[in-house]
Amino acid sequence: MRQNIKERKNKMKGKKVITYAVSFLVALGCVSAFPVTVKADTGYEVYPNPHSMNYSDGDYEMTSQVNVVYEDGIDEDTKARLNEVLALKGMNASVSSEKKAGKTNILVGVKGSKQYVDSQFGTTSAGLFDKLDSYALKSDKGTISILGKDTDAAFYGLTSLYHIFKQVEGKTIRNFSIEDYADVASRGFIEGYYGNPWSTEDRCKLMEWGGYYKLNSYFYAPKDDPKHNAKWRDLYTEEEINTKIKPLAEAGNKSKCRFVFALHPYMNHTIRYNSEANYQADLKVMQAKFKQVIDAGVRQIAILADDAGNVGGANYTRTLTDMSNWLKELQPSYPGLKLTLPFCTQEYMGWGQSYYRDFPENVQIIMTGGRVWGEVTNNFTSSFTDTAGRGPYMWINWPCTDNSKKHLIMGGYTTFLHPGVDPSKIQGIVLNPMQQSEPSKVAIFGNACYSWNIWQTEEEANKCYNASFKYVDHNGYEETEASTALRELSKHMINQNMDSRVTRLEESVELKEKLNAFKTKVTKGEKITDEEFDDIINEFTVLQNASQTYRASGNERIKSQIVYWLNCWDDTTNAALNYIKGIKA
């Protein structure tokens, strides 16, 4: 009798624990089996999705020695991208001024240059090169040609070729053509979260990776650099320039995911507008600071006025006009210097002000979407455009975890980036990520896809989301056990557990009903069949295996930044499996 009572107590204890474990799983998540999928032979996979990609009959064998023709307007970083492409197949290049018989020819040029590649390329769709960052790429019977709107656009064409070369078997490539462009001018991420700052290596690695997906902006606004804000008037020391600024500028220029250096001159020791002499003196201080980083390699700057006192529309307009004119004066001496000037307004949480219409045309107006945790929606972008006379530069506070640091936010594509938004009413989109730079790539990949070619449906967004994990994990099109495990884990690490200020993100969607039904039976003490037990045991086992798989073979940098969550999966699944099996017995 005592033994039976003890057994019943142990079973009741087990039921309480498994109720807790399943409740935890509903909150944290669970995974189903994760077989590696094989891509169907439907063509080359390129992300972001090109606007147009077509295939012609046939293919050809590329030669190991290729002949390359570069036009004068192609910069060294774009040439380096082609060398990287060729290295994927162990191919070597010699450079000449025209096509050579007996070799695969690769031609890289700029539209409208009237040089060799421009004249040889042939026709393209009307209006293609009126679009942002547009390029045409074609592979045709032994010749690969890339024609860009400028050298950056040619770089994007070569980046598409990079992803195609990764899928080429041997050296046999299909005949195809791509015509492509960006929907949004500025695409990237901003280091503006509250939390542990990224290291210089984190920042460089993220820019390098972003360059493979046609991102063009790493917006520098970290909380750990006093010379960005509190001491914005002070120049950097030589050591700071060499260890902090130059490496970031170099990584940004090489990847074309440029290091956008921002100053916040409106919060501490602010620009003075109380006299002409004071204003001119402060303007020179700000220009000297920007000039220092431009000399160190920075090729785009930005100005912030958020969370500070409002100095008035006329004063903002004057400063932005003066800075725009100054950039125009500098540009001839600094190749690649961007005239585009992002500006974060004091009213960044609002819906726009009419005085923004007075800003110079090159100024991009940074807004968060009508609230702090705003979203890219037609409602906001259309309303703002009607008021300001131009589209907003969207600062989206996702997937940042400022108010939920115990969480990883590994999803939310269509919640924050709505399908079908009019691209003509958006000038930029940057995401504010988590303090964990590497897992933030899942969301950043979504922005890369969206800002280049805005998805029209949830299905398109889901396709990008499911594809993201292989590109996040190993920058390639092939599914691996590790990337599949990361995807399955991530589907259950999405909800940010915040208040009504932010739209709730759902996780564990595919398993929620099953888990809740099991939890109800455990709680009520209802009979659970062996099949139901085995089903839940399988789910926990697959989850356990996913964690172990990623720990064993996943990306080292990602693993190091999500190790506490992997540990949590291990502990939870061990406890849950032991108790479930105990109850079943």
Each language-model region and where it sits:
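Catalytic-core regions of glycoside hydrolase
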Residues: 166, 193, 308-462
